[in-house]
């Protein structure tokens, strides 16, 4: 699929919809999808930190794990990550380790802070 054929807004809305799934399951409002170079969703995830008692179970990490499992590789070169909120430093680095090509997000770190998430300390260090 040619890059200009990918509907970024539509994919962002899918990630936002997963953030609603996360809220409905009793977790934080963060969702994520990963598409391959053909525009096919190969991974998705939502925040499971509270549900799994796992501080690394952010939506992006869950989507990366899901995508890697689905394609049978840790290398997501050429893939695009869409997330409901700007990735925290941990998630951003996980995406870099996975060779994610591009990242798009609906809300930024300041929006997250405005609803009570304490990510600033990780950006300021």
Predicted regions, residues:
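Active-site oxyanion-binding pockets that recognize sulfate/phosphate
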Residues: 2-5, 53
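Short, basic/aromatic recognition patches
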Residues: 4-25
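Zn2+-dependent cytidine deaminase-like catalytic core
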Residues: 13, 43-125
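Glycine-centered short loops/turns at secondary-structure junctions
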Residues: 26-27, 99
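Short beta-strand scaffold segments in enzyme catalytic cores
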Residues: 30-36
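Short, glycine-anchored, charge-dense loop/turn motifs used at functional sites
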Residues: 38-42
């Amino acid at each position: 699929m040619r890059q200009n054929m990918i509907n970024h807004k539509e994919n962002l809305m899918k990630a936002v919809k997963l953030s609603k799934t996360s809220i409905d399951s009793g977790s934080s409002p963060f969702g994520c999808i990963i598409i391959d170079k053909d525009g096919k969703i190969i991974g998705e995830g939502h925040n499971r930190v509270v549900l799994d008692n796992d501080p690394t179970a952010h939506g992006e990490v869950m989507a990366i794990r899901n995508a890697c499992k689905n394609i049978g590789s840790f290398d997501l070169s050429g893939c695009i990550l869409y997330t409901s909120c700007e990735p925290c430093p941990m998630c951003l680095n996980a995406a870099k380790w996975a060779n994610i090509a591009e990242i798009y997000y609906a809300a930024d770190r300041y929006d997250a802070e405005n609803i009570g998430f304490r990510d600033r300390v990780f950006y300021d260090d």
